């Protein structure tokens, strides 16, 4: 894998993007069209930062509607208005994690070829020989590709697969066989499992998030009528590419799924903004090298300038590859060849090194912070991963979780999904789990501890759910781990639709 001269590559990408969008109405509105892309980079970036704000999808669409004075068109028709953000009509739109749609440029569509090359690189590093009949399988959440007004709308992975040139070998799944699953995530999972059961012997590489693997394992076990490992489903699997997601909370469960298989795990990060990072050193799990030579420009905003909903504050400081500081946490923003300028990924990363530009993916930017407690998924994942190691001797695993905030009770409301029915577990153990999570959060978070100490936050209440309890219906768009709805309504919906046991943590103080 080649990725040298990070700063020079980023300067080149930045100038290229500015030159490409110069004649667009969006560039005129922001002031980016007035910039001289041949100017020295430090001065150019400073001027750019003054005129172009970092924005999320809602802010982008709001600006585009102001420019066009169009309050009624759908997002596809709006974005494809002539000369608005691009010089050509976009033919591919991908769904964001929150259910919006965003145009994909050619760079993003072709990134699956980079991932295929990366898998070959990983196999060479591990001395794994792949035959011509061996296949890679890509998992994604929604199967259908919808056609609207000259454009295809789908999950990014589905669009990438659909746009692979005819003369190249196409990875799995076979799109035409899963399209009938439509927009249902559950039906898409069923369709993918159908293909895995038919073609599993030829699959040697699996590209999927930890969450997708856990969901797949639950469905596979339901079909078999017992807990089932992947040894029979994917007998020749050698490489798992952990696709854009945190792993540790599911580590023990996934290890049990791969029992009897010699599977090597590597990590990647891929966003519909065009951001792509790969674990180039197979011995350094989670350390990802951003691909800075692919026509994408990265910006970094310190997390202290991001609110609890993931929105970047207007006063935010902004850094580029040449000025970013190692060992600090940032929210990444991206500008790309599609004409999107400084769009936030809403992902928090820790920068490891500047050249090459390496990061560790931590979490989504959203957090629970109404009591100034700053409870986020990275912290919770670490706590639950540590607790799962203790629970291993009891044959108990916390498989998944969701936590929200009840403003009336001033406490967090949790739903914890266990690997077995809570009715089969001693209540003393369940109560201990609740108290242990609360105590570990107090020990590991000054803000959580302070909120408890000042009585702005009361001890949490936790609903213990059986296996599959957080998969009985599809989660709202964008919800994973943290429930930002009013008074934890999503968490309560899961609790009310499950047989569950409820426990409240003791009022522990950490001195």
Annotate the PLM regions.
Residues 87, 140-142, 243:
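Cofactor-binding loop segments of dinucleotide-utilizing enzymes, especially the Rossmann-like FAD-
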Residues 120-172, 179-180:
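Conserved AMP-binding loop of ANL adenylate-forming enzymes
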Residues 12-16, 27, 31-93, 99-106, ...:
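Active-site diphosphate/adenylate-binding microenvironment
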Residues 94-95, 204:
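Ser/Thr-centric signal marking residues that sit
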């Amino acid at each position: 894998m080649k990725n040298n001269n990070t700063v020079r590559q980023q300067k080149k990408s930045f100038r290229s993007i500015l030159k490409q969008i110069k004649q667009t109405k969006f560039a005129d509105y922001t002031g980016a069209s007035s910039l001289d892309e041949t100017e020295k980079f430090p001065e150019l970036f400073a001027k750019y930062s003054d005129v172009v704000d970092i924005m999320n999808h809602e802010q982008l669409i709001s600006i585009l509607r102001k420019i066009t004075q169009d309050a009624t068109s759908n997002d596809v028709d709006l974005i494809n208005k002539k000369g608005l953000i691009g010089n050509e009509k976009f033919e591919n739109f991908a769904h964001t994690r929150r259910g919006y749609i965003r145009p994909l440029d050619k760079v993003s569509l072709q990134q699956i070829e980079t991932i295929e090359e990366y898998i070959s690189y990983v196999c060479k590093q591990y001395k794994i020989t792949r035959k011509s009949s061996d296949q890679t399988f890509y998992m994604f959440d929604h199967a259908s590709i919808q056609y609207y007004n000259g454009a295809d709308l789908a999950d990014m992975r589905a669009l990438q697969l659909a746009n692979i040139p005819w003369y190249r070998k196409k990875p799995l799944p076979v799109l035409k066989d899963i399209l009938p699953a439509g927009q249902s995530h559950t039906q898409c999972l069923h369709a993918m499992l159908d293909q895995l059961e038919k073609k599993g012997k030829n699959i040697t590489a699996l590209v999927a998030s930890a969450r997708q693997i856990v969901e797949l394992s639950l469905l596979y076990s339901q079909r078999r009528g017992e807990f089932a490992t992947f040894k029979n489903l994917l007998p020749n699997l050698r490489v798992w590419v952990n696709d854009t997601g945190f792993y540790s909370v599911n580590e023990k469960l996934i290890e049990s799924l791969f029992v009897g298989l010699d599977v090597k795990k590597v990590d990647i990060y891929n966003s519909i903004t065009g951001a792509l990072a790969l674990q180039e050193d197979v011995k350094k799990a989670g350390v990802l090298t951003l691909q800075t030579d692919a026509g994408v420009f990265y910006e970094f905003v310190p997390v202290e300038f991001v609110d609890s909903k993931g929105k970047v504050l207007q006063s935010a400081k902004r850094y580029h590859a040449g000025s970013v500081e190692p060992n600090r946490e940032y929210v990444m923003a991206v500008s790309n060849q599609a004409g999107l300028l400084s769009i936030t990924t809403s992902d928090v990363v820790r920068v490891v090194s500047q050249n090459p530009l390496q990061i560790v993916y931590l979490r989504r930017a959203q957090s629970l912070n109404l009591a100034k407690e700053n409870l986020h998924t990275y912290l919770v994942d670490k706590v639950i991963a540590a607790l799962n190691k203790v629970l291993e001797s009891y044959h108990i695993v916390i498989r998944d979780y969701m936590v929200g905030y009840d403003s009336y009770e001033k406490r967090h409301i949790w739903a914890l999904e266990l690997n077995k029915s809570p009715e089969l577990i001693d209540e003393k153990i369940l109560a201990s789990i609740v108290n242990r999570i609360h105590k570990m959060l107090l020990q590991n978070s000054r803000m959580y501890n302070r909120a408890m100490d000042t009585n702005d936050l009361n001890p949490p209440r936790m609903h213990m759910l059986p296996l599959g309890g957080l998969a009985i219906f599809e989660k709202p768009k964008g919800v994973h781990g943290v429930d930002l709805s009013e008074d934890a309504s999503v968490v309560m919906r899961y609790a009310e639709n499950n047989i569950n046991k409820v426990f409240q943590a003791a009022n522990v103080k950490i001195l």
